[in-house]
Amino acid sequence: MTYAPVNDVLSGKLAVDSEVTVRGWIRTRRDSKAGISFLAIYDGSCFNPIQAVVPNNLNNYDNEVLKLTTGCSVEVTGKIVESPASGQAFELAASDVKVVGWVEDADTYPMAKTRHSIEYLREVAHLRPRTNVIGAVARVRNCLAQAIHRFYHEQGYFWVSAPLITASDAEGAGEMFRVSTLDMENLPRTDAGKVDYNQDFFGKETFLTVSGQLNAEAYACAISKVYTFGPTFRAENSNTSRHLAEFWMVEPEVAFADLNTVAKLAEDMLKYVFKAVLAERRDDLEFFNDRINNEVIARLEQFVESDFAQVDYTDAIEILKNCGKTFEFPVEWGIDLASEHERFLAEEHFKAPVIVKNYPKDIKAFYMRMNEDGKTVAAMDVLAPGIGEIIGGSQREERLDILDARMREFGIDPEHMDWYRDLRRYGTVPHAGFGLGFERLVSYVTGMGNVRDVIPFPRTPRSASF
């Protein structure tokens, strides 16, 4: 017997009149007076379920088929036939229905066929992938991840797996989760009364990583073109629609490169993955366009056709000051652009994706290359219409003396970053990279307004269920 994904049947990959078995879950069951039941079966391979037409002459029709409810798992065997009804081209004329698993109590099943609020679905994150919306998010998320890997592979980049446990703070912000095996009720102390991390598992303080960038730099300074793609962690007490404590980052790093190199790389990558999702997950995007945000498809299509604008931070500040618009957060040189500023630039002024470059040094990280003016660093943010910042990057500081000075400005002892300084001591090169928050990318593509709804099991302040 041939087992077939629902997508293969509905897309016409399999011949009409061929016999197949589909395996999945019941979305709905509808019974006709003519003694026929219509089962809508989904397996997650595509957005739409397949309709199985079940006659009442099956041996288990009365005692099993008529008792099927939403969520029951089944194996249905039958012939592929052209569907006379509108909505899908093919359906299954069932000759056998095997019940694999029952829903214990249909009345209390959390995923009953009524539409649920997004907020409710967060409370049942282990069951929410069974819904149309979260199933579609999962397929789009997968498509984007595969497209990212494919893009970098085609561009000659090597994927590097950065460590999740680190002794370095890549952002210098200190908002990190500590990793420790010490007994919290009986902490060892030094003579000065501080916690003695020499007795901890690693013999020092360690944390969950906030970025794979510093490790990626080490490999870029040896094999030239690399990227990381993995989870990162921020102990930032932000309960907003844009923040997670655990999220995924895409971080390319390129040797012998400057800010312009990675600005072009960012544009090429975003256009590549958006073209991929438009081509490969059209059914899911049409659902998001219909139910979540009616600009999703048009926004992506316009994005891939747009030329990115570029503007210096200083010029962007002047644009914002002189635009005649009153912002909630006042505009002056030296501020970090707020979301309202970013979206005005992308949506109203440039009406296109825009790369803002050369930010004040005091609002950017220690590793960003100092510009000749001594006031700004070679940093960039990519701003997208509809969301604002989607990528942040920079040319890295390759000059050891300036890097050391910047570390001290941030209160970082250069000796604690000796391995990172070695990259400048031994064959230093100009290099650059950026970070893309993967959940923000998925949110942008799907139109889902909250990043908690585009990651399988969100981790946020005071919330770590499942």
Curated annotation (Swiss-Prot):
Annotated compartments: Cytoplasm
E.C. designation(s): 6.1.1.22
Leading EC class: ligase
Pfam families (alphabetical): tRNA-synt_2 (PF00152), tRNA_anti-codon (PF01336)
Family from the record: Belongs to the class-II aminoacyl-tRNA synthetase family.
PANTHER family for the chain: ASPARAGINE--TRNA LIGASE, MITOCHONDRIAL-RELATED, ASPARTYL/LYSYL-TRNA SYNTHETASE
Name the UniProt record assigns to this protein: Asparagine--tRNA ligase
Taxonomic lineage from the root: Bacteria, Pseudomonadati, Pseudomonadota, Gammaproteobacteria, Vibrionales
This protein's encoding gene: asnS
